[in-house]
């Protein structure tokens, strides 16, 4: 039986916080559906006056959902060997996705770039996952004082 470190609790809390962020974005889409009168199952508005804003709110949520599975995978796996680093990167990803969404909500898609932090954090999470795989396979030693190359 594998035993996770006590610090893995931070990873679990980060995953829970990410769910709250995704839920927040979903609620924003629901509110926008009412405001802009876009009924289910219609995905996008064709209203020439306000449809663009609704579509930006919808896309911000969908774009986040598109990267959510890899985020959760990298969070869970990278956190096995690097729970603190992964939790910090996970929180940066969450903040970045909120900045991305609210930039997109302006109706000017280029303002999504405010959330570039989320992309950088996701690359970092991928790196910790690859590093964790190397450590698990014994290709690098674990720990800072191992006397050889490691992923730390």
Curated annotation (Swiss-Prot):
Which residues, if any, are the signal sequence? none
GO MF terms held by the record: glutathione peroxidase activity; glutathione transferase activity; identical protein binding; leukotriene-C4 synthase activity
Q: Which residues lie on this side of the membrane: Mitochondrial intermembrane?
A: 1-8, 92-119
Q: What is this protein called?
A: Glutathione S-transferase 3, mitochondrial
Which pathway does it serve? Lipid metabolism; leukotriene C4 biosynthesis; Lipid metabolism; arachidonate metabolism
Where does this one sit in the cell? Mitochondrion outer membrane
Give the bilayer topology.
Multi-pass membrane protein
Q: Which UniProt keywords apply?
A: Lipid metabolism, Lipoprotein, Lyase, Membrane, Mitochondrion, Mitochondrion outer membrane, Oxidoreductase, Palmitate, Transferase, Transmembrane, Transmembrane helix
Disulphide bridges: none
SUPFAM superfamilies, per database record: MAPEG domain-like
Q: Which organism is it from?
A: Bos taurus
Q: Name one GO cellular component term.
A: nuclear envelope
Give the residues carrying a lipid (S-palmitoyl cysteine). Answer: 151
Show the catalytic activity: leukotriene C4 = leukotriene A4 + glutathione; 15-deoxy-Delta(12,14)-prostaglandin J2 + glutathione = 15-deoxy-Delta(12,14)-prostaglandin J2-S-(R)-glutathione; (5S)-hydroperoxy-(6E,8Z,11Z,14Z)-eicosatetraenoate + 2 glutathione = (5S)-hydroxy-(6E,8Z,11Z,14Z)-eicosatetraenoate + glutathione disulfide + H2O
The transmembrane residues are: 9-29, 71-91, 120-140
Tell me which family the UniProt entry assigns to this protein: Belongs to the MAPEG family.
Q: What does this protein do?
A: Displays both glutathione S-transferase and glutathione peroxidase activities toward oxyeicosanoids. Catalyzes the Michael addition reaction of reduced glutathione (GSH) to electrophilic eicosanoids to form GSH adducts, as part of detoxification or metabolic shunt processes. Mediates GSH conjugation to leukotriene A4 to form the sulfidopeptide leukotriene C4. Metabolizes cyclopentenone prostanoids, specifically mediates GSH addition at C9 within the cyclopentenone ring of 15-deoxy-Delta12,14-prostaglandin J2 (15dPGJ2) to form 15dPGJ2-glutathione. L-cysteine cannot substitute for GSH.
From its record, what is one biological process in GO terms? Answer: leukotriene biosynthetic process
Topology: which residues are Cytoplasmic? 30-70, 141-152
Q: Can you tell me which residues the record assigns to a coiled coil? A: none
EC number, UniProt record: 2.5.1.-, 1.11.1.-, 4.4.1.20
């Amino acid at each position: 039986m594998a035993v996770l470190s006590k610090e893995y609790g931070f990873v679990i809390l980060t995953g829970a916080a990410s769910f709250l962020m995704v839920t927040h974005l979903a609620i924003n889409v629901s509110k926008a559906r009412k405001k802009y009168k876009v009924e289910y199952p219609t995905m996008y508005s064709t209203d020439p006056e306000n449809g663009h804003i609704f579509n930006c709110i919808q896309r911000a949520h969908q774009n986040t959902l598109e990267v959510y599975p890899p985020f959760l995978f990298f969070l869970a796996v990278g956190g096995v060997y690097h729970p603190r680093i992964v939790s910090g990167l996970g929180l940066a990803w969450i903040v970045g996705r909120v900045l991305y969404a609210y930039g997109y909500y302006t109706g000017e898609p280029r303002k999504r770039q405010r959330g570039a932090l989320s992309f950088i954090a996701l690359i970092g999470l991928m790196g910790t996952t690859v590093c964790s795989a190397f450590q698990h396979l014994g290709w690098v030693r674990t720990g800072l004082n191992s006397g050889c190359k490691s992923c730390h």
